[in-house]
C-alpha cells in the first residue's frame, strides 16, 4: 500500500495571513485578543490560537469596550464594520483579500443600482459577509442568494436586464459553472466578474484532488467538518467514483477503510495545517503504508501583506 500526496494542499495565502494576524496581534498588544468568528475553519488552528490568548466570539456585543477585535478570513458585513467603528474598537481585518474583492464587486453593483445574484451556501460566514455589502443606502438594487441549479428555476429578480452575479470563493468549480450557465440562459443580459471569483487556491486544490482520484482507490481529506473548501474536496473525489472521507486528524481514520486498498490519496483543505497531514501519514504507516510520493501540482507563490502595524515582528 502506498500513499500519494496532493499538491498543492493545506494552507493558502489568505489562511496564512489570517493566522499570522492573530498571532502578531497577541504578541504586539498582549492577550486577550478577540476574534469575531473562527478566524479559519479548523479546530486545531483555533485551539492553538486560544492557547496563545485569542478569544473567539460570534458577535461584537461579546467584545468589551476598548478591546481589540479581529475579523475572520471569511469577512464581515458593513453593519459589523459600522458597529465596531461606533464603539471605538481597535480592528484588525483578516478578511482574505480575494473575499474583499467580491465585497467590492457587490458594493459597485449596488451603487450602480443593479440587482446581484450571489452563488453560495446559506449560513456560511463568507456568504453572510458578502450579502451584508448590500444596503438600501448604497442603491436601489436587490441581492439574491442562489445555492443550486434548482433555485435558478424559481428565482425572480426585479431587474432582469440590470443584473450581475458573484460567487462564494470556496465553492466547487463545476457546480458553480453549472449554476452560472443556468442563470445566463434565464437572464441573458446578466453581467459577471472579469475574473472568476472562486479563488486560485480552491481551484488548485480541486484540480489536485481530481488528479489523486484518477490514481487512487481511497482519498482522505484533512479538514474540519465546517470547512467549506475541505468538504468540496471530498465531494469531488466521491463524484469521480473514489471512496473518500473528510477527517479532522489521524485519530478519525477507520482501519477498515484501508483494507484491500493499494493506493491511498491524501490532501488537505486550505485551512488545515501540514502538521495534521504529517500525523495522518504517520498513522497510515502504522496501518501498513510503505511508500509516500507527491504529485507535481500547480506551484503557489501568492503572499498577502499584513496590516502595517503588525509587519515588524516575527512569530513562530
Curated annotation (Swiss-Prot):
InterPro entries: LytB/IspH. Keywords: 4Fe-4S, Iron, Iron-sulfur, Isoprene biosynthesis, Metal-binding, Oxidoreductase. Its cofactor is [4Fe-4S] cluster. It is an enzyme of class 1 (oxidoreductase). The active site is at 126 (proton donor). This is 4-hydroxy-3-methylbut-2-enyl diphosphate reductase. One of its GO terms (biological process) is isopentenyl diphosphate biosynthetic process, methylerythritol 4-phosphate pathway. [4Fe-4S] cluster binds at residues 12, 96, 199. Binds 1 [4Fe-4S] cluster per subunit. Isopentenyl diphosphate binds at residues 41, 74, 124, 227-229, 271. Catalyzes the conversion of 1-hydroxy-2-methyl-2-(E)-butenyl 4-diphosphate (HMBPP) into a mixture of isopentenyl diphosphate (IPP) and dimethylallyl diphosphate (DMAPP). Acts in the terminal step of the DOXP/MEP pathway for isoprenoid precursor biosynthesis. PANTHER family: 4-HYDROXY-3-METHYLBUT-2-ENYL DIPHOSPHATE REDUCTASE (PTHR30426:SF0). Pfam families: LYTB. HAMAP family: IspH. Belongs to the IspH family. One of its GO terms (molecular function) is 4-hydroxy-3-methylbut-2-enyl diphosphate reductase activity.
Amino acid at each position: 500500500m502506498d500513499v500519494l500526496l496532493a499538491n498543492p494542499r493545506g494552507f493558502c495565502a489568505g489562511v496564512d495571513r489570517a493566522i499570522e494576524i492573530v498571532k502578531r496581534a497577541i504578541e504586539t498588544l498582549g492577550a486577550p485578543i478577540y476574534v469575531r468568528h473562527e478566524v479559519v475553519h479548523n479546530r486545531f488552528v483555533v485551539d492553538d490560537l486560544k492557547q496563545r490568548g485569542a478569544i473567539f466570539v460570534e458577535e461584537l456585543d461579546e467584545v468589551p469596550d476598548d478591546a481589540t477585535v479581529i475579523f475572520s478570513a471569511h469577512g464581515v458585513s458593513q453593519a459589523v464594520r459600522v458597529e465596531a467603528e461606533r464603539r471605538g474598537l481597535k480592528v484588525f481585518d483578516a478578511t482574505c483579500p480575494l473575499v474583499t474583492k467580491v465585497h467590492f464587486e457587490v458594493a459597485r453593483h449596488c451603487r450602480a443600482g443593479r440587482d446581484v445574484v450571489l452563488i453560495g451556501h446559506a449560513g456560511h460566514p463568507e456568504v453572510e459577509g458578502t450579502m451584508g455589502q448590500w444596503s438600501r443606502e448604497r442603491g436601489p438594487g436587490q441581492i439574491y442568494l442562489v445555492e443550486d441549479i434548482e433555485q435558478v428555476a424559481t428565482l425572480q429578480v426585479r431587474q432582469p436586464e440590470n443584473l450581475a452575479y458573484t460567487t462564494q470563493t470556496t465553492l466547487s468549480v463545476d457546480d458553480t459553472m453549472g449554476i452560472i450557465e443556468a442563470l445566463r440562459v434565464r437572464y441573458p443580459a446578466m453581467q459577471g466578474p472579469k475574473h472568476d471569483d472562486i479563488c486560485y487556491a480552491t481551484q488548485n486544490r480541486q484540480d489536485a484532488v481530481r488528479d489523486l482520484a484518477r490514481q487512487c482507490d481511497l482519498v482522505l481529506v484533512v479538514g474540519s467538518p465546517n470547512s467549506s473548501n475541505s468538504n468540496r474536496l471530498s465531494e469531488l473525489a466521491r463524484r469521480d467514483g473514489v471512496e473518500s472521507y473528510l477527517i479532522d486528524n489521524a485519530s478519525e481514520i477507520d482501519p477498515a477503510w484501508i483494507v484491500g486498498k493499494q493506493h491511498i490519496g491524501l490532501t488537505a483543505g486550505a485551512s488545515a495545517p501540514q502538521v495534521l497531514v504529517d500525523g495522518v501519514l504517520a498513522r497510515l504507516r502504522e496501518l501498513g503504508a510503505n511508500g509516500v510520493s507527491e504529485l507535481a501540482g500547480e506551484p503557489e507563490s501568492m503572499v498577502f501583506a499584513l496590516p502595517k502595524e503588525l509587519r515588524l515582528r516575527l512569530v513562530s
